[in-house]
Structure formats: C-alpha cells, structure tokens
C-alpha cells in the first residue's frame, strides 16, 4: 500500500479489486496549487483507497493533509495553514450515472478509467483551501492592527466636502 506513488489511479482495476495508495507528494510537484501559494515548500501526505461501494459503484475515498504557506489577507505576510481533505468520489462515465449519483459523493469524470494522481490531489486541496487565508487572531497580524489603529483616528483638520455646497445654497 505504501511506496512510490503511481502517476495515475486505475479505476478499472478498482472495479475488479480494492486497492490503496499511501505516500507523500512534494508540494512543488503540483503547479496549479503552487500558483496560489506563497511558497512551494512542504509535502502532501495522502492515503487513498479505490474500490467498490455496496451499490457496486467504483469509488475513491481517503484523506490528504498538508501544511501550506499562503498569503494572509489581513497583513499580506505569509501564514502557514494546515489543509485537510477527505475525498468521497465516485467514477462516472455518463450523464445518467452523474444524475443517479447519491449525496455524499462527488463525481470523478474519466472516460478511460485513468485519473492523474497529481491532478486529483491538486483539485481536492484547492477546494479545501480557505476562501480568505489569515492568521489566527489579531495578535499574529501585528503590523496590520497597528496600522489600522493609526488610520482609525479621525483627522480633525479635514474639511467637510459639503461646506462649499452650503455656501452656494445660501446665495451671494
């Protein structure tokens, strides 16, 4: 079950016999994922199993864990976040199979029964990323909170932009 990871999952093989994969992928080997990260450092630990469910559907389940470095959207500094994905995928080849897919499964589209492992891992981790990556709590974004406090003070010397309109309304 462990060892070198194959380049693809063989879903046709999973229809005949359940098999599993376990291993690590370097983050830098996932270019679509690294495009949204602050750094390509780290590894993705994955454990996947492909086989038949009780309804005789070919399914892929498992887990993926990684510590990824993203850009904090509060202070714009790097932030390391643990990302976890638990895919529950079912192989579908036709629109009818897609329509009959029960809740709890996401479709895994493949005409030939081969799914590129790195693409699958990339897709699942991209979906697991937070919409707005940020540090936990305000203390970690020290530069942001100090800058925000400095700009939050009202500027007393600032003029009211509508004062000139009030003069025009009164007339000459």
How should each PLM-predicted stretch be described?
Residues 77:
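Short Cys/His-based metal-binding microdomains
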Residues 1-69:
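A positional/architectural concept
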Residues 1-18, 43, 80-172:
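Charge-rich, low-complexity linker and terminal segments
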Residues 71-74, 140:
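The −1 position to Zn-ligating cysteines in a subset of zinc-ribbon hairpins
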Residues 34, 73, 152-153:
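Amphipathic, positively biased hydrophobic alpha-helical segments used for protein targeting
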